[in-house]
């Protein structure tokens, strides 16, 4: 089940489908560099498809295993509940389509390419009687910018198209897989893929490496730094009592 989910996400079922051509595709920026002040950005994808073909563009982050803790609200409190293992969780899943997916592709075609929230839920192992988990997980991912999947956001001028994606403030190092699909009569025709490396630099890279190598020491250092900043603020802006 886990392996099948990962295959769905990456669209490797393409080998079983008819041969397709390649779309001309480019992404800007070609590389993402995260400094300490990184707070998200915009990734623009441009390409060329045959006039009349519908276009779907997807940005897929690194896929990894992840444990998600479902939280439930009890009165004013949020309590930790069920722990859910996500077999193939992408760092980000961003999708733009010219029209609703159900108008562009047959259900089995979209599912085979891992396109849409239904295919994503299946890849995560949250289909069937676990769809209630997918609904809550996707709500959280949308709020953090990790998930965005819907129609619109693609501009066309003849055969040329462009899509813009808002990137979240937190991106792990790795490679974003940018894919474009030309849809024709319910099937995927041409497609194109380009990779966008994500790298941390400067102090952000140092802190990330410190957190990875010495998590306990990093946590202690972060706590001491927060305490020091609090003391400095207290000294700089002393509380004045009313007379």
What are these regions, as identified by a protein language model?
Residues 5-14:
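Bacterial N-terminal signal peptides
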Residues 45-49, 163-165:
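Aromatic/hydrophobic beta-strand junction motif of beta-rich domains
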Residues 189-220:
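Short, aromatic-rich amphipathic segments at membrane interfaces
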Residues 39-45:
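Structural beta-strand segments of beta-rich domains
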Residues 170-200:
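Extended, hydrophilic extramembrane loops/domains of integral membrane proteins
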């Amino acid at each position: 089940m886990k392996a099948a989910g990962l295959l769905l996400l990456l669209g490797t079922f393409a080998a079983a489908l008819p041969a397709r051509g390649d779309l001309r595709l480019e992404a800007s920026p070609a590389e993402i560099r995260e400094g300490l002040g990184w707070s998200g950005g915009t990734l623009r994808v441009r390409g060329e498809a045959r006039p009349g073909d519908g276009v779907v563009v997807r940005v897929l982050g690194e896929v990894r295993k992840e444990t998600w803790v479902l939280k439930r609200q009890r009165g004013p409190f949020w309590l930790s509940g069920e722990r859910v293992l996500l077999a193939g969780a992408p760092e980000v899943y961003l999708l733009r389509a010219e029209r609703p997916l159900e108008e562009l592709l047959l259900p089995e075609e979209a599912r085979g390419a891992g396109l849409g929230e239904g295919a994503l839920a299946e890849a995560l192992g949250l289909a069937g009687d676990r769809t209630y988990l997918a609904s809550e997980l996707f709500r959280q991912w949308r709020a953090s910018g990790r998930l965005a999947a819907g129609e619109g956001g693609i501009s066309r001028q003849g055969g040329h198209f462009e899509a813009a994606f808002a990137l979240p403030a937190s991106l792990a190092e790795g490679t974003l897989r940018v894919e474009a699909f030309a849809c024709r009569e319910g099937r995927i025709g041409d497609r194109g893929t380009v990779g966008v490396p994500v790298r941390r630099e400067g102090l952000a890279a140092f802190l990330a490496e410190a957190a990875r190598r010495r998590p306990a020491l990093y946590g202690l250092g972060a706590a001491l730094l927060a305490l020091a900043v609090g003391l400095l603020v207290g000294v700089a802006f002393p509380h004045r009592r009313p007379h």
